[in-house]
From Swiss-Prot:
PANTHER family: E3 UBIQUITIN-PROTEIN LIGASE PPP1R11, E3 UBIQUITIN-PROTEIN LIGASE PPP1R11-RELATED. This is E3 ubiquitin-protein ligase PPP1R11. InterPro entries: PPI_Ypi1. Residues 107-119 have a biased composition (Basic and acidic residues). It catalyses: S-ubiquitinyl-[E2 ubiquitin-conjugating enzyme]-L-cysteine + [acceptor protein]-L-lysine = [E2 ubiquitin-conjugating enzyme]-L-cysteine + N(6)-ubiquitinyl-[acceptor protein]-L-lysine. It comes from Xenopus tropicalis (Western clawed frog). GO terms for molecular function: protein serine/threonine phosphatase inhibitor activity; ubiquitin protein ligase activity.
């Protein structure tokens, strides 16, 4: 719709007013939220057969081997521990095998002089 007014008698300015009508419809936007189950935190759970790590209340699941404390030169390893405690299980993830009496490899040969594991 448009309106205009004509010239005034005194020779004044002409003014016009323009009005526009539009059919504006509100936009209908939809928002979809997808809820996802939160991932659980990674946990380590110990079973009753997990070996205590050096009697300190800590537990280890990396290997079935038991750490052997370095001994002074000449001390026999059989004096304080059984030879049956070495890695003979088939589930050892590091591939350790029990040393046979015919081989020169001992269960502690996987360790260097500082007592850490060598692989």
């Amino acid at each position: 719709m448009a309106e205009s007014s004509g010239p005034t008698a005194g020779g004044g300015a002409t003014s016009s007013t323009v009005t526009t009508e539009s059919d504006t419809q509100p936009e209908h936007r939809s928002l979809t939220l997808k809820l996802r189950k939160r991932k659980p935190d990674k946990k380590v759970e110990w079973t009753c057969d997990t070996v205590d790590n050096e009697n300190l209340g800590r537990r280890s699941s990396k290997c079935c081997c038991i750490y052997e404390k370095p001994r002074p030169f000449g001390e026999s390893s059989s004096e304080s521990e059984d030879e049956d405690d070495c890695c003979e299980s088939a589930h050892c993830i590091r591939g350790h095998k029990k040393a046979t009496s015919g081989s020169k490899e001992t269960p502690s040969s996987h360790h260097d002089k500082t007592g850490s594991m060598q692989h």
